Each structure stands twice: as structure tokens, then as C-alpha cells.
Amino acid sequence: AVQAAYGFVWLCIGTEKKPLFQLQEYDVAAARRVPCGAYGVRTSPLRGIENFLDMAHFPYVHTGILGAEPETAVKPYQVEWREEVDEIWATECFFTQPLAAPSSPQPQETEYVYRVASPLNAILYKVNTAAEGIIPADVVCLFIQPLSETHIRAHLLMILDDQTSSMTDMVLFQQKIFTQDKPILENHLPLKLPLEKLEIPTKADALATAYRKWLIAKNWSYGVHQNTHRGHVA
């Protein structure tokens, strides 16, 4: 099935089990829809999504923007598998950020809500205290186009309640963040994502752990690192 939505063309090459996820903010006329480009990355599609879901790297990779020392701790948050829509959600996510958005006048504790709408598509809802209330939160979308099991094209889309920043400033803000992530992703070995045993999670990884368990429940194998007890790596 082929479908046009949210400025992209979507393709389902298998049996379609559910309709394309809803993104209601995209249809709000006063909100600003900001396509931020597509980026080739040598990594697994699943690694790309999991990096997007991680807050712990903010102070170290996005220093002075999404985080900064000494505010490095990830506060406990809630994670749930919403079975009625088959999505993973994380709520009550808070992180102190020096520059939460181009329009942010000062550092703030930012509230995040993460939504994994499908294995290769994730959405971040980010409360912008400088916003005017046109939409409940700014929206940052990561749509992964797999080119192979270890090579992706990452598409970024923002839907913002920002009536003051220029389009260029908004795009450059998101591009800077992603280009900081890219070398981390490309040097993260193995490139494919191990779903269990090989990597040890911490409390900050509750969302990533839920994502991996969700993939296991789906018997997902594309882009997954296969590790056997005999030490064979596929």
C-alpha cells in the first residue's frame, strides 16, 4: 500500500496490519510545519530510533543546547505499551536544558513525551514555555527510511508553536542536533541493535528497554544483531 501523509510518501511492502499513525498537530493551520531534511547514517534503523529516545546523552553530546553538566541525571519517568494502538509511550520526562528551542529566552526544565508509533517512526512532544498555546507541545518527528540493515536515511519533521523564529533558524537548530548525533551513531558497535543480553541497561534506559521488548514481542529481525551462545555474530 502507498499513502501520502505529513509531507511524505509511505509504503507498506507487507501485509498492512494497522493504518498509518495519526499526527493531529500537522493539520493545525497556525502551527509551523518545518521539514528539516534527510540524513544518511551508517547505522541500523533501530539504533536510529533508540538514540532519538535517549535523554542520558543530552549533556555530553548536545552540550549547551539540550543539556549541560552538572545537570546530568535522568529523572524517573513512566513508560507504557498502549496496546489499543500498539505504541510505546513515555511520559513525565523532564530534563534541564540551556536552549530547549530557538525561541527559548532562558534555560528551563523541559517536559518531554515520547511516542514510538511504529518500529521505525518516533515522535517527541516537547513543551515549549515560550509558545502561544496554538498546539499543546512542539512536535519533533523522526521517520526512518531503511536503505539496508546498517544504512538509513533519517527524515526529520518539526511542527512548532513558534511565531517568531525564522524558518532557517528552526531548521539549523534541529540540523545541529542531528549532526552531533550522527558520529555517535556511526561509531556505536555493533551497528545492528542487540535486543537482549549483549548490552546492560540502566534506569535511564527504561524507554529503550520497553522498545526492545516490544520488538521481541513482534518477532522483529530486520536490523537486529544476532548473538548466539557460541559467539557467532551475524
What do these predicted regions represent?
Residues A1-I13:
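Short Fe-S-cluster ligation motifs
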Residues K17-A234:
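C-terminal catalytic domain of Rieske-type non-heme iron oxygenases
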